[in-house]
Amino acid sequence: MRKLFSFGRRLGQALLSSMDQEYAGPGYDIRDWELRKIHRAAIKGDAAEVERCLTRRFRDLDARDRKDRTVLHLACAHGRVQVVTLLLHRRCQIDICDRLNRTPLMKAVHSQEEACAIVLLECGANPNIEDIYGNTALHYAVYNKGTSLAERLLSHHANIEALNKEGNTPLLFAINSRRQHMVEFLLKNQANIHAVDNFKRTALILAVQHNLSSIVTLLLQQNIRISSQDMFGQTAEDYALCSDLRSIRQQILEHKNKMLKNHLRNDNQETAAMKPANLKKRKERAKAEHNLKVASEEKQERLQRSENKQPQDSQSYGKKKDAMYGNFMLKKDIAMLKEELYAIKNDSLRKEKKYIQEIKSITEINANFEKSVRLNEKMITKTVARYSQQLNDLKAENARLNSELEKEKHNKERLEAEVESLHSSLATAINEYNEIVERKDLELVLWRADDVSRHEKMGSNISQLTDKNELLTEQVHKARVKFNTLKGKLRETRDALREKTLALGSVQLDLRQAQHRIKEMKQMHPNGEAKESQSIGKQNSLEERIRQQELENLLLERQLEDARKEGDNKEIVINIHRDCLENGKEDLLEERNKELMKEYNYLKEKLLQCEKEKAEREVIVREFQEELVDHLKTFSISESPLEGTSHCHINLNETWTSKKKLFQVEIQPEEKHEEFRKLFELISLLNYTADQIRKKNRELEEEATGYKKCLEMTINMLNAFANEDFSCHGDLNTDQLKMDILFKKLKQKFNDLVAEKEAVSSECVNLAKDNEVLHQELLSMRNVQEKCEKLEKDKKMLEEEVLNLKTHMEKDMVELGKLQEYKSELDERAVQEIEKLEEIHLQKQAEYEKQLEQLNKDNTASLKKKELTLKDVECKFSKMKTAYEEVTTELEEFKEAFAGAVKANNSMSKKLMKSDKKIAVISTKLFTEKQRMKYFLSTLPTRPEPELPCVENLNSIELNRKYIPKTAIRIPTSNPQTSNNCKNFLTEVLLC
């Protein structure tokens, strides 16, 4: 039993150590490489920098670092109240969790940052959120020494009975943490004294385990239950007895005595007020309870005697009690104790099973722990290898960057040398420029002399341009006159087209009248022959009108072509005007030309509209022709060849339109050769079809002549026999009436038969549906019959099985009697074997306890070794990280140096570009000045000199730089302002 209690104590110590690791160290273990810019600013408490980061990127409000910590978590952990208020003002997530599911409120409470916690609670933070271990903010407040945070949390409705994963309420957690002031505070705030953890330990048991006598007195003052047992069936008194905590045990015994005295007083007071019948029952109950208490005390005394550790005070107390209550109750107590012993045995068996299961679970946990440790070792080796690879890569990058730096140094030196050479070349260029400026002064003097002659030439050129402009204006006037004439022609063509449209409308009216007359002819059949000739004459007249309209259309097309040619001539004239205007640079002519172009485009659009109207008219003519052909078909068979002629006309019209298109296409530019080819192919196909249609027309005309001859013969025959057969017309009419009556009757019969057929078909459909329904019912009936047959078979089988079961029951009854006898024998044997097993179990339990102690020792030793190895690895890892950070800092320095070198190179390259541009400008100026000098020297007037008789003319000499005099030449000028006037005139000409 003592070993079991020591195991409980060790378990409590282990829990305390794990709890210290869990709650120790306020804030976070922070490394700089894990953080972003906003997180660093929050840790430093730089609210302005945090606000700047948020204005740049609003998403960074709830941004996480590499360990899932937000800005609010870090600010609360470090007590940065300004940053916390800023983030809450920006409406960040107040109850956001980190990797361990801890809220910013938990971090503020854990770090004892009361101001941050108050701000969070006032902004509506939830104090009842649980982390991975099931702890709330109140658990963290209990672990701290002060009670102000706990008061704040309780005022904001924190749950005082919140359970963590170990089953600890804040009160139990305070006892485990040995925080007496927190226990007092929680008891004042009505915390539950009778709460129990996962091992069913009460607050009193935990206080006894941790040897906290002051907390025990507090709990006893609150009337806590002394008799409550934990998972192992032990009370607080048992733990005090086994741990030799005499003062605590004495406190518990004194509390028991007080409770008994109070109970007896209450009983006496009640008995005085109650009836005598109820008094006996009360006394018997009180005696029974008292006897049970005495028996429990005797049991404790026996245990104390066996251990020889009970003080003499308790023995004297037991003897006095024995003397008070007498020996006559001992027999009853012995019987009760026997019953309790049987119950204890059963409990011990049940507990043994539990302990075995717990041992198995502990072994499994150890195995899992070893596996996890191995996996951690593998992970550590992998991480070490990975970091070593990263270090090698960084070293390689460092070497590469060093080589690049050396190259850049060489490039820099080379560029410096080039810059020096450029400086020298610039110095030489400047010297040359000074010389050129001196020469320029000489050239300017000569140029002023030439300005006068140029001015005269420019005046003559301007007079010529004015003459040309006058000619152009005259030509434009003529073009406008022609344009107006063309407009008049266009109006005339429009009027002609309107007249033709009216003529077409009249033709349409004539056609409609002809159709009406044809209908009347059909109705008036006897007078048909006389009216046929009239309709044929009208048809011929209509054809003549159509031909006339076609001729008029051809004339209009020719007029349109002439107008187009005139438009092309106008374009040529306008192009000539443009060339003249470009040479003369006259703005007025350009504006007039634009107006003419607009008018020309307008005329073109109108011409296109005329062509469209013409095409529509052609379509209307074709429709008229087709309608005529249809009417002629209905009128007689003999005039069927007209269809062929109409088709021929249509095809001929199509060929004519295609030729027109060809004519238009020939005028277009050379870019549309492909369209030309397609049109040529279409023309060839249309010619071929036109030839075939002509052949067919000839054949149709021959057939038409034959039909006409037949018609003439028939007409003559009819005229001959008209008088003779006039009497027969009445008979024919009566025959026709009879045939019509018969035809109507047949139609009625046919309709009746169709109606009967539809009725029969509907009846057939209904019968088919009824047939399907009956077929389905038949199938269902067959299925029912099969099921009935199966049920009958099953019934027979069940009857046979019932008979078999009855026979078996009789046999079983006989065997039961034998089994009962055998059972009684087995029970006796089982009792004997159970006694043996109890002895064996006690031995094995002792062995198991020894093995458990050894396992715990081995585990602790292995854990210590692993912790040491982990610490070594962490040290190595920290060294690696420091080396990596040093390398990164060096890299950043190299990068900064590289960036500076690049900037210097860029600035040098820009300077070089500027110098190159300056040199190019100077060279262009020199070149232009050389050309000017040559031009001026070539245009100087020749003067005879008496001193040089051999020289006749300056133009015959090649003026090179050798022959230019170094002294300044002075030429007298009559007007000193002429040079400035010339300059202004030249600038105006260049701007134009």
UniProtKB/Swiss-Prot annotation:
ANK repeats lie at residues 67-96, 100-129, 133-162, 166-195, 199-228. Transmembrane segments: none annotated. Residues 286-310 have a biased composition (Basic and acidic residues). InterPro entries: Ankyrin_repeat_domain, Ankyrin_rpt, Ankyrin_rpt-contain_sf, CC144C-like_CC_dom, DUF3496. SUPFAM superfamilies: Ankyrin repeat. Keywords: ANK repeat, Coiled coil, Repeat. The keyword Protease does not apply. Residues 278-310, 378-618, 683-713, 743-899 form a coiled coil. Disulfide bonds: none annotated. Residues 262-320 are annotated as: Disordered. This is Ankyrin repeat domain-containing protein 18A. The gene is ANKRD18A.
